[in-house]
Amino acid sequence: MHKVTNIVVAGLGGQGVLKGTDILADVALRAGYDVKKSEIKGMSQRGGSVTGDVRFGHHVFSPMVPAGEADFLLVLEPTQVEPHRYMLRPGGVLITPDAVQADRLPSKKTLNVALLGALSALLDLPEEHWLAAIRANLPEKLHPMNLDAFQIGRRAAARLRP
């Protein structure tokens, strides 16, 4: 049986949860994996909870990450840690704004990409795929600050290794 990597991204409406899952799915596709993605928007337009699941591997059958099976949980808003912690498998990795020193980012709107930067250092996916996916999924004027945020997150990941 081939391993499927399960990732959950959680936050509030307007924080870029879904854009983050778009970038992540793009990276896995570029790496040649079968990718499935799902999202739960809730009251996202009013700042409510938003969750995105990304699963990739050689054969992925369902887009939803089963409870207790997430290898990684990326949380953009600290209040969303506890409501989503049950998604992590034992030994899974939680990545929060504190992990990437969010106060040092070029903009708070780059937090989603900074968390992806941290994740990128923990996954065996080529860095060039991450950079290409960021460029492909964001407007050109946002590339410099998001590429900076990605590298900040990537450097911060040394503290997250399981």
For every predicted segment, state its role.
Residues 1-162:
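Active-site cofactor/cluster-binding pocket
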